[in-house]
């Protein structure tokens, strides 16, 4: 596999249920850290192209800046250029673009809502879900 896509939802894990249930909150800075680890792990396995969904928090830009500054980045990172709406339509549009690009897989740090939107938008690309959402309920 030479390329992967990453769809990190900056809105996942911020539901009111997290606050009232004393659940762990995964803020967007931690999502940047998670995506950095995904990129480093992928490039360690031979991935040389990483495509990241553009988003309102600029997770992809922060990842590129941090890894370039640390001189750890060897893979090419590119943001998927879409018209941002700040809602699920960004996830759906990006997943469809990544499938058209034939990335090796999509890695999705997000919740069951993010992953459901991706799964409904793709047919052939494997999806790797990383739980960072509120409920994270997945059917069998």
Question: What does each model-found stretch correspond to?
Answer:
Residues 96-99, 116-120:
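A broadly conserved amphipathic alpha-helix scaffold signal in soluble, globular proteins
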Residues 8, 54-55, 109-112, 130-132:
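Glycine-rich beta-strand-to-loop/alpha-helix junction loops that act as flexible
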Residues 10, 14, 18, 115-118, ...:
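Basic, gly/Ser/Thr/Pro-rich low-complexity segments located predominantly at protein N termini
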Residues 105-109, 117-140:
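Short, acidic/small-residue loops that bind anionic groups at enzyme active sites
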Residues 1-105:
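ATP/NTP phosphate-donor binding region
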């Amino acid at each position: 596999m030479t390329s992967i896509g990453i769809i990190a939802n900056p809105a996942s894990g911020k539901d009111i249920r997290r606050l009232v249930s004393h659940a762990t909150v995964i803020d967007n800075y931690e999502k940047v850290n998670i995506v950095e680890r995904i990129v480093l792990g992928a490039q360690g396995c031979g991935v040389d192209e990483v495509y990241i969904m553009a988003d309102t928090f600029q997770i992809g830009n922060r990842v590129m800046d941090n890894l370039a500054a640390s001189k750890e980045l060897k893979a090419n990172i590119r943001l998927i250029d879409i018209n941002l709406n700040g809602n699920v339509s960004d996830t759906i549009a990006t997943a469809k673009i990544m499938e058209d690009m034939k990335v090796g897989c999509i890695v999705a740090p997000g919740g069951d809502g993010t992953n459901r939107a991706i799964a409904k938008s793709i047919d052939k690309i494997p999806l790797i879900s990383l739980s960072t959402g509120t409920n994270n309920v997945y059917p069998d």
